[in-house]
């Protein structure tokens, strides 16, 4: 008996986009004739199978038959269908401290296919043995941003720009941006200098400016939406199936309070922003402004510190490095968080 599966043109485009752009694939089985991959994705705005809840467990069988590649897809235990495509490119991604992952791309639209069997997938196992994207991973893969490159990344303002300039997307809180490029995502963000990170004691959180400003202003009250994890993160390595607490490693954090003036509740992380004992507020907006602001402009154009009277105080600059993280780690960070993913997809 032949099993047929098809989908409309719109569904074909969105499914292809989801599988290519929102999933990092782990090889879980193979034989001479097939490969089986697994991915765990956070909730998606373009692809939502039934009962997806807050995350989507994707299982994919891939094999070649009669001149085309056949994809058999199962999501959250429900078989979605099988589809044909002319070409499949599998890109192996080896990342320090992480298991090998794959990115899949499909040459042409996903079309209807016919198979003579009902696909069977491997049993799903879930493990917390992999720590995901840790500070060690970030410091290993990040690169300092040269000043000439930083000047070409516009983060505020519009109007006439140099043809070499590119506009980045601001990610929620302070000091983090994403630049979508044809070759993939590039994340730009401020992070504590490595020497300071190794001496500060906390080796679990990624000490981004975004995270530390949120920690400094967190009120800690039960039910505060700014201080509570949104519970939508997933493990980008696919080892753990389900939603996980973020553990201070995402760039989705925002200050607890108005972006223009958030009260400092926790002194220890606040010391990374200002030397003065008079510091009362942290601001996710700069004490200086201009019609156009680039990453090459000073830190005073991106953040600020105020005293109790609302006067601007000097911002610490020597403790921060402006770094960039590129594919595939940038995509893993974005696609493990529904907040970040919705900003750029």
From Swiss-Prot:
GO terms for biological process: symbiont-mediated suppression of host innate immune response. It is found in: Virion tegument; Host cytoplasm; Host nucleus. Keywords: Host cytoplasm, Host nucleus, Host-virus interaction, Inhibition of host innate immune response by virus, Late protein, Viral immunoevasion, Virion, Virion tegument. One of its GO terms (cellular component) is host cell nucleus. It comes from the Viruses. Pfam families: Herpes_UL16. The keyword Membrane does not apply. Residues 55-63 are annotated as: Nuclear export signal. This is Cytoplasmic envelopment protein 2. Residues 90-94 are annotated as: Nuclear localization signal 2. The keyword Phosphoprotein does not apply. Plays a critical role in cytoplasmic virus egress. Participates in the final step of tegumentation and envelope acquisition within the host cytoplasm by directly interacting with the capsid. Upon virion binding to target cell, a signaling cascade is triggered to disrupt the interaction with the capsid, thereby preparing capsid uncoating. Additionally, antagonizes the viral DNA-triggered antiviral immune response by targeting host STING1 and preventing its dimerization and trafficking. It comes from Human cytomegalovirus (strain Merlin) (HHV-5). Belongs to the herpesviridae cytoplasmic envelopment protein 2 family. Residues 26-35 are annotated as: Nuclear localization signal 1. InterPro entries: Herpes_UL16/UL94. Interacts with cytoplasmic envelopment protein 3 and with the capsid. Interacts with host STING1; this interaction prevents viral DNA-triggered antiviral immune response.
